[in-house]
């Protein structure tokens, strides 16, 4: 039987959400780095008894709240997304169960059965953002695809986006007419010569 990726891709306004990261090791630092790289205005709190130097530097460069403590479910109050990165599987499962009871989306790092969402590879060029998922099967493949797209998408792609946005503002008609006009205007971008 053929398998497929049934995940629904969504782009979140992280500034409007409160993200909680549980753990202070390498994985927490990596998750924080990629979250802030994509959404530098994200509201983030990290709970851990210790933090790596790189995590401290990131927290100081951005508006990240550090709480020196072990996990307690009271830290879930007011949170919208939670990422569990501890090296203690029982704690990660506890975080997962606590989040599920509160209807909070949760990601237990490197444990797909305990993930409501994955943090895939992300390519950003100006206003263009592409997210890549392997359905949790191969983060390395997502990383390589991200590197590929970073290389092949031109740096000036944002100029195209801005120009099309300006053109869109000048189009007359109802929504369907505008879509048809834009589709006709942009089909040359993908036509094979």
Give the positions of each predicted feature.
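A short, basic/flexible loop-to-alpha-helix module at the beginning of a structural domain
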Residues: 1-14, 119-120
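Glycine-rich adenosine-cofactor-binding loop
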Residues: 10-33, 163-175
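Residue-level detector of alpha-helix initiation sites
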Residues: 26-27, 90, 136
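NAD(P)-binding Rossmann-fold cofactor-contacting core
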Residues: 30, 38-58
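Glycine-rich, highly charged phosphate/nucleotide-binding loops
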Residues: 60-77
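ADP-ribose/adenylate-binding Rossmann-like module
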Residues: 81-87, 92-118
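E1/E1-like adenylate-forming module used to activate ubiquitin-like modifiers
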Residues: 105-158
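An accessory alpha-helical subdomain
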Residues: 136-193
């Amino acid at each position: 039987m053929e398998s497929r990726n049934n995940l629904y891709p969504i782009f979140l306004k992280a500034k409007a959400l409160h993200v909680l990261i549980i753990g202070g090791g390498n994985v927490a630092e990596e998750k924080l780095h990629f979250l802030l790289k994509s959404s530098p205005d994200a509201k983030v709190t990290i709970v851990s008894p210790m933090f790596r130097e790189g995590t401290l530097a990131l927290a100081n460069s951005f508006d990240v709240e550090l709480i020196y403590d072990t996990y307690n479910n009271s830290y879930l109050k007011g949170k919208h997304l939670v990422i569990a990165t501890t090296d203690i599987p029982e704690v990660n499962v506890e975080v997962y169960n606590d989040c599920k009871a509160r209807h909070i989306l949760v990601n237990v790092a490197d444990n797909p059965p305990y993930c409501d969402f994955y943090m895939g590879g992300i390519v950003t060029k100006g206003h263009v953002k592409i997210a890549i998922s392997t359905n949790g099967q191969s983060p390395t493949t997502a990383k390589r695809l991200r590197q590929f797209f970073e290389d092949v998408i031109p740096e000036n792609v944002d100029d195209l986006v801005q120009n099309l946005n300006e053109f869109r503002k000048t189009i007359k008609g109802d929504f369907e007419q505008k879509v048809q006009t834009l589709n006709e205007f942009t089909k040359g971008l993908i036509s094979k010569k």
